[in-house]
Structures are given as structure tokens and as C-alpha cells.
């Protein structure tokens, strides 16, 4: 009986809190609608810290999220970005479990920010770091997917590709690359767009996405004739490579790399990627030098990381973030 009464009182208290937040939110909205942006912004900040000090983390986060959206709708991007940072602060301090809804909310705020603002860079960095509480060492793959799609819509293909590589969305990555290649690339390099992506996915030990991005890209690109076999030697190489990775036979991998050396020389990074793929999937030992030298080595080390544990599941990242060239 006492427990039931306590639960009932708790429900009433929760309802009162929600009602109080809604009333406050209504007043703040009215202030913004009148154009009192500075006053409203300061009031949002005051309420945030008050709620946080009272351990009302959910109320604080929801109020900042709705406030950020409100400021964005009135083209007050600086105030909106500031409240967006407070949303992250509430997540960080409360140690909230990563959920798809929260990731969608963060991606929504990201999509509304000025693409060229330093606030956006800081926001995405903190959001990815917070999301590591879920899956993936370098940010939740789902958040990477949401970010990649936003950047793709903005035609920022360079950064979109980076985030797709750290997602599990091989199909989305392929569709973006088709658009990227068709709008920005040379016809003679139509094969190189997907070859780089496949090799990088494999270096991240994501066989599934590597296969999906290759199949989707070669089927949908208007300048690629249906295969296999393909007109472009590099595409045939990748097709054979994906089969070899599934088989795991070192002799097949070695002969394949030897036979396609003329085509692989089109990009000096290809053989560096293949060295790593040989270690991950075919049991090859690392090179004698513990790290690769020169500019290419810096790029590869940033892609692969150093001294990491190779015993990971397909699709789980075991490297540092990729530097894309």
C-alpha cells in the first residue's frame, strides 16, 4: 500500500515537472517569437544550469534541444549552436545510454548548423566522442551514417565519404560515390572512386560493407558496363580480391596482386592498403619497419592505427580515423 502511494506521488511529481517545463518553454518561445533573442538565450542558459544542479538532466536536455530548434527556425544560429552544445553537456554529465533517437537528435542539430562554422566542428567531435559509449571506438556507426547523409546532401562528398567509411552503410556509401564520381570526377577515374573505398573498408576489417559498396557502385554507375568481368582491370581486381578475402588463401592473394601490378600502380596507396589487408586476412607478417615512412606512411598509419588488436569482428573498427586524400 505504501509502495503504491509512493509510486503515485512520484508520478504526480513527474507530471508536475513536465507541466512546469512546458510552461517555461511556452514563455521562452513567446520571448523568441517577439524577437527578444538575447534575453531568451540567457534565460535558456540559466534554466539549464538550474536543472542540472537539481539533477533534472532529462528536462535540461529536452529544453535545450527544443530551444536550439526554435533558434534555428529564427535564423539565430549562434544561440542555437550554444544550446546544442548544452544538449551534449547534459548527455556527457548524465552518462546517458546511447540510443538511436538521441543520435537522430544530434544529427538533426548538426544538419542545421552553419557548415563552415567552428561550432559545428566542435559539436561533431564531442558528439562522436560521447557516442563511443555505444559501439565503435571512433563514434557510433549509426551517428556516422546520419552525418554522412547530411554531408552528402550538402555535396560535401569528401567528408561524407569519411563518415560512410566509419558507418555500416555500404549501400549509401556507394550511391554517394556514384554521384561524387559523376559530378566531380574524370570518366577515366570512374573505377578509382570505388577501389579506394573497398580497400579502406577492408583495412577497417569491414568485409560486408566492402562487398556491398562494390556491388552497388558497379551496378548503378552509368559509366560502368555490367560485369564481372569488367572493362576496367581494377574492377576485376577488386572482384577477385573480395573472393580471395572470403577464401583466405595466401597464394591466391599473392598471385592476384602480382598479376594486377600495372593497374595497381595508378595510385601508390593501393599497395600500402594491400600490405595491411594481407596482414588482416591472409596472415602475412608486418613489414620489418614498425611504421611506414614518408607521406604515404603517415596517411596509412592514420588509417590503420598502430599496435592495435587485429582480433575483431567484421565491421568493428580497429584503427584510428581515416585521412582521406
Swiss-Prot record:
Subunit details: Component of the bag6/bat3 complex.
Function: As part of a cytosolic protein quality control complex, the bag6/bat3 complex, maintains misfolded and hydrophobic patches-containing proteins in a soluble state and participates in their proper delivery to the endoplasmic reticulum or alternatively can promote their sorting to the proteasome where they undergo degradation. The bag6/bat3 complex is involved in the post-translational delivery of tail-anchored/type II transmembrane proteins to the endoplasmic reticulum membrane.
Cell location: Cytoplasm, Cytosol
A Gene Ontology term for the protein's cellular component: cytosol
Claim: Flavoprotein is one of the keywords in the record: no
GO terms of biological process kind: protein insertion into ER membrane; tail-anchored membrane protein insertion into ER membrane
Protein name per Swiss-Prot or TrEMBL: Golgi to ER traffic protein 4 homolog B
Family: Belongs to the GET4 family.
Pfam families: GET4
Region (Disordered): 1-22, 306-325
Keywords linked to the UniProt accession: Cytoplasm, Transport
Composition-biased stretches (Acidic residues): 307-317
Tagged with keyword Isomerase: no
